């Protein structure tokens, strides 16, 4: 289980795709602290299991179902990713419960800025929107956010400048 509070952005060093799965190598620092083989790490909100690690990063397997339901299939060497370690019992709980089991992928339709926020309008199909509730929690690329508006074919979230600066959302 995760909280949606991104600990760092890592970089994809390599990705080896097979016909039905992939192996991804990610350069990281913070999430390596006290890492063990078999530990869970959220990569853009997707729960992956560390299968190997070094002082420079970790490796994880990505199953066929995960490639089909998430945007991890789009990763390339050099891609930046949001990373978070699994929540430790008794640990600080700053976001919302994020299981790391992805329901689907939306598309950023519009980005607008106002004084202290960046608004993201995201198009999504009914298979995703049936789970989206105004003022409810949602994880986008693993980031804990609150839904500000819901429309028949899209929803919107508002992001503070700090969150935009330390996550992938700020690079869109």
Regions found by a protein language model. Give the residues of each.
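Conserved loop->alpha-helix
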Residues: 1-172
């Amino acid at each position: 289980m995760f909280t949606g509070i991104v600990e760092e952005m890592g970089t994809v060093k390599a990705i080896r795709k097979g016909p039905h799965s992939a192996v991804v190598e990610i350069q990281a620092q913070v999430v390596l602290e006290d890492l063990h083989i078999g530990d869970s790490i959220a990569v853009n909100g997707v729960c992956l299991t560390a299968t190997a690690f070094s002082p420079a990063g970790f490796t994880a397997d990505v199953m066929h179902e995960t490639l089909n339901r998430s945007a991890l299939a789009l990763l390339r060497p050099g891609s930046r990713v949001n990373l978070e370690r699994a929540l430790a019992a008794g640990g600080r709980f700053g976001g919302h419960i994020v299981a790391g089991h992805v329901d689907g992928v939306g598309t950023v339709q519009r980005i607008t800025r106002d004084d202290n926020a960046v608004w993201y309008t995201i198009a999504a199909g009914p298979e995703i929107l049936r789970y989206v509730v105004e003022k409810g929690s949602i994880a986008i690329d693993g980031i804990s956010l609150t839904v500000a508006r819901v429309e028949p074919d899209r929803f919107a979230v508002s992001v503070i400048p700090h969150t935009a600066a330390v996550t992938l959302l700020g690079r869109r």
